[in-house]
Curated annotation (Swiss-Prot):
It comes from Shigella sonnei (strain Ss046). FMN binds at residues 70-75, 117-120, 153-162. The keyword NADP applies. Gene3D superfamilies: 3.40.50.360, NADPH-cytochrome p450 Reductase, Chain A, domain 3, Nucleotide-binding domain of ferredoxin-NADP reductase (FNR) module, Translation factors. The gene is cysJ. This is Sulfite reductase [NADPH] flavoprotein alpha-component. Component of the sulfite reductase complex that catalyzes the 6-electron reduction of sulfite to sulfide. This is one of several activities required for the biosynthesis of L-cysteine from sulfate. The flavoprotein component catalyzes the electron flow from NADPH -> FAD -> FMN to the hemoprotein component.
Amino acid sequence: MTTQVPPSALLPLNPEQLARLQAATTDLTPTQLAWVSGYFWGVLNQQPAALAATPAPAAEMPGITIISASQTGNARRVAEALRDDLLAAKLNVKLVNAGDYKFKQIASEKLLIVVTSTQGEGEPPEEAVALHKFLFSKKAPKLENTAFAVFSLGDSSYEFFCQSGKDFDSKLAELGGERLLDRVDADVEYQAAASEWRARVVDALKSRAPVAAPSQSVATGAVNEIHTSPYSKDAPLVASLSVNQKITGRNSEKDVRHIEIDLGDSGLRYQPGDALGVWYQNDPALVKELVELLWLKGDEPVTVEGKTLPLNEALQWHFELTVNTANIVENYATLTRSETLLPLVGDKAKLQHYAATTPIVDMVRFSPAQLDAEALINLLRPLTPRLYSIASSQAEVENEVHVTVGVVRYDVEGRARAGGASSFLADRVEEEGEVRVFIEHNDNFRLPANPQTPVIMIGPGTGIAPFRAFMQQRAADEAPGKNWLFFGNPHFTEDFLYQVEWQRYVKEGVLTRIDLAWSRDQKEKVYVQDKLREQGAELWRWINDGAHIYVCGDANRMAKDVEQALLEVIAEFGGMDTEAADEFLSELRVERRYQRDVY
């Protein structure tokens, strides 16, 4: 359990007091933290002065509700910044995570702002799935008294760019809501668009929302604030890589690395279920190849965020080189008048396919042109950190953080290519080398608060990572609840990630059951969803006993296939029709008994 606090400007504690509080709670288990929380709440409620100072409930006056639907933290940061802007304007505002929002109250909202990202094939973030499903169901209410605005974050390298925001925007209007502002669809480089949009939202709401008393605006504005740390995406910790171990066999088609990073005395804290953000540098050899293909030298001065840098340095540290997009292909075609690429312009499907199959450097190789350095920089997108599900618990590893990295490797016409962050960690950071990292907290993927609750973990491939953290935590807490793992990969002998650890947990009785699916070890392919169906009766018994279900891994295929298998198990062994099974699984999601970390 992580203490949740508002931004430093709103903290009632000074930095020294906050440090003492964090130090005092570092070694407490989730159960102990919950008790301490209750203890202080009891102390507070025994003090009449504290009660007298409590502001009136926000429900007594209408205000603004911001719903944050975030997958990687960007949407949450935009929502929090908007909340702070509205508080500064002395407006009554409430910020709530989509997963905590009681969506049946949406009909009573007068002023509603939705900030959402998109995942997978145009799907809403995990924490917003239940709200999305409700709004698109027959149960959705009319919203004639609701004015709304939507800010949508996405990645134009994907086909269904900002689809979740488009869905929310169109459905809220269809239900009778009034658009305060047109929807904004923001790409990876979203900050400028978000800043402009926030200013327009504040202006639009000043004339429509009541001004709150300072105590009320602060109290409601701090609702569901997530975490605080001296380190963040924009101010990462410079840590050191201590272990880089290949954990797939010599003959495996996959290169999977177990990476351990030493956090030193930074005090950086995380929980099982969180992700590690990794800032990486592009391969100097890739930078050199791209520069030479464009007949540049690499020492040309370019401007990056107001600073003048040599082109080589800018490309290595500041720009995305390993992920192509339809926009880049289209802009390069138009800029260079390429005879090969111009026929693709205007055809979205062909542009998407070309971008997905042709890295930027090979696009330039196949369609050579001469660009000046600034034109190249303007063509590219800013480099963004990669997120990896954390594979460790600090209850066991203390000042370390572990991740499980599937290294992306492929060939383009005989030339070896690799993923930016995965090859950085696997190939280019030496032992004790520097790695810039931060924690991306994920409160939508948490172990049950009750240690007696059974846990079902479904994680093929590198989706196994958070469940290693879960088991370390359950073992450290001596949690009596049962644990069941479903894992799959191509081959038993080559791809059984962390095999010795799982066998030890089984022997010690910590891991109650383990079901394994090896897709290439026999004639018929077997996947984790097949194992779920095979164990349907027992799975249903666990669910009836209150088990929490966790899924981690590929969003596009695996997660959908697993969900379909779960629906079939619920329908068959729960005696339900398809609609009732879907409703049952939706209720599990709302109750936080069905959680997914998919990508």
